């Protein structure tokens, strides 16, 4: 079960392309919930619970010629969903290839890490001879219900090789941390520090929709007044002749 948990932590980039969710930093209250729409790669919209816009990605259709002309090796990496990882028998990612990883986060490193929690597992399994070199050690994971979805829950303890994507906002705190990973998306839907000065700190994420159709109009600064094809369009043909 531990290997399943770690492989699930590596799998997020290949399990979904768009996500609609609510996010809460803990400790916090319902007033601090953020509603989010995310479409890979790089498109993010954030609102307050009452619909006030907090952030919307701009420039998602801009030319990237300056980026490629920079001619760095990283600038030519493909998005993760365009490269093929090594899968285990359950269809989870055992070994991640080199790719252009990264999630939009609007300055919140924990949110970006939660969307792709590979920092809890590393890009590949560690050698059997050195099990202590895992980024975190795990208690036996178990299946739980999280907001109506199946998740794997465990308590993790940081190892010497743990390297959070944002050192200031890690998923795993010093001491023990309760972690939940959504089984369908590979997203870390909950974290909570259990020890020390950080006790109670973490996050809670509620998934509302996966792989929904999202127009560009949702993410740009000004509406392009595009038609949402999901909505019924009525045709008024006037009175009969």
Q: What are these regions, as identified by a protein language model?
A:
Residues 1-92, 153:
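N-terminal mature ectodomain segment of secretory-pathway/periplasmic proteins
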Residues 19, 141, 154, 191, ...:
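Generic beta-strand hydrophobic packing signal
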Residues 25, 50, 158, 193-195:
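Short beta-strand segments enriched in hydrophobic/aromatic residues
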Residues 31, 56, 164-166, 189, ...:
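Short acidic, gly/pro-rich beta-turn/loop elements at beta-sheet edges
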Residues 54-60, 165, 199-205:
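A short, polar/proline- and glycine-enriched secondary-structure boundary/capping micro-motif
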Residues 88-185, 189:
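Extended beta-strand-rich segments in extracellular/periplasmic secretory proteins, especially
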Residues 93, 134-137, 146, 170-176, ...:
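Non-transmembrane domains of secretory- and envelope-associated proteins
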